Design a protein with these regions (language model features):
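Non-catalytic, C-terminal membrane-associated alpha-helical segments of glycosyltransferases
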Residues: 232-239, 246-312
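A conserved acidic beta->alpha catalytic loop
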Residues: 22, 40-49, 95
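Short aromatic/hydrophobic "clamp" motif used to bind/position activated sugar donors
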Residues: 88
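Conserved donor NDP-sugar-binding/catalytic core segment of glycosyltransferases
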Residues: 100-133
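Acidic donor-binding loop at a coil-to-helix junction in glycosyltransferase catalytic cores
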Residues: 160, 184-197
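Glycine-rich, basic loop-to-helix element that forms the pyrophosphate-binding segment
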Residues: 67-83
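Short, well-formed alpha-helical segments that are part of the catalytic scaffolds
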Residues: 12-26
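Short, flexible, basic/aromatic active-site loop/helix in glycosyltransferases
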Residues: 136-158
Length: 312
């Protein structure tokens, strides 16, 4: 088997059907053997019915796997273990892929030059950004699960997002799977399992390629264009960053188990937030404050521990 597409899902049977329909419409050379593995992370809706319907309609192309352990990373790792492909691609259950997505995303991974690849994630519909949104800060688009490094292919210097990425399967054998202390699960929206893995292999010297022609469409609901959504997302991002990187090794002074340097940075960015005149600049500084607050909260919960939770 050449390629396995892993799609993890939880209680999104309606958007799942649209995602699977876009995968059924993929155009790859007839010589390429590929499959879609739907990993159901203990859904309570009609997810299994939808997935098994596609298995019946496209025998040999779609498979269904039930993973009872809550948490997206558990579902991802279960899918990797059950996959048949030498290349593993990932897409989310609320996204749709353009017909040439899989071919463009994986075309450079059949040799040994590239360990993985990532493509563009664009809004499914045109959206109007509010005045407070900083349009010149590409990193903020990640909050909306959007990703672009331009229109030219080339090496990636930052990890792609999980709804449009692929890796040679041997990368998981070499570097481990997705960390199970990261990623959405019931009761927690701490993300980062996708970018942590991509960052892990980039830090190890592996090379990843940006494929702008590999396009995934992702919905951006009005709720995600509200300040509170961004603030919550960046607070959770701070918590995720602390789980990934822990306490800085040069930290020497602590207050209630939290590095004093985090409080200093929090004070500095709070001052910048207060003094900024531009609405976009003010909000950008405010997001940094919320990120640092998330790091402080997570640091307080973990005390002085520098232990890293390994991938399973």
């Amino acid at each position: 088997m050449d390629i396995t597409v892993i799609l993890c899902t939880y209680n999104r049977c309606q958007s799942l059907a649209k995602a699977l329909e876009s995968l059924a419409a993929q155009t790859l050379p007839s010589a390429v053997e590929w499959e879609v593995l739907v990993v159901d992370n203990n859904s309570k809706d009609q997810t299994r019915t939808v997935a098994e319907d596609y298995s019946r309609r496209h025998p040999g192309r779609f498979r269904y796997l039930f993973e009872p352990q809550p948490g997206k990373s558990h579902a991802l790792n279960a899918g990797i273990r059950d996959s048949h492909g030498d290349i593993i691609a990932f897409i989310d259950d609320d996204a749709t892929a353009e017909p040439t997505w899989l071919q463009n995303l994986t075309s450079g991974l059949h040799g040994n030059e590239w360990a993985g690849a990532g493509g563009r994630i664009v809004p499914a519909k045109n959206i109007s950004f509010p005045r407070w949104f900083p349009p010149d800060e590409p990193r903020l688009f990640r909050t909306l699960a959007l990703f672009s490094c331009g229109l030219e292919p080339g090496p990636l210097t930052e990890p792609p997002l999980g709804t449009n990425m692929a890796f040679r399967k041997e990368m998981f054998d070499r570097y481990g799977g997705f960390r199970t202390d990261l990623g959405p699960c019931p009761g927690s929206e701490i993300r980062g399992e996708d970018t942590e893995f991509g960052g892990r292999i980039l830090a190890a010297g592996a090379r990843m390629r940006y494929e702008p022609a590999a396009i995934v469409l992702h919905p951006v609901s009005p709720d995600r264009l509200r300040k509170q959504y961004f603030l919550t997302w960046w607070f959770d991002k701070g918590r995720s960053e602390f789980r990934q990187f822990g306490i800085p090794r040069d930290a020497t002074w602590f207050v209630a188990g939290v590095p004093l340097s985090l409080f200093r940075r929090l004070a500095r960015w709070t001052l910048l937030w207060i003094l900024s005149i531009s609405p976009a600049r003010r909000f950008s500084c405010r997001l940094k404050v919320w990120t640092l607050a998330g790091q402080i909260v997570e640091s307080y919960r973990h005390g002085h521990s520098r232990e890293t939770v390994t991938a399973s």
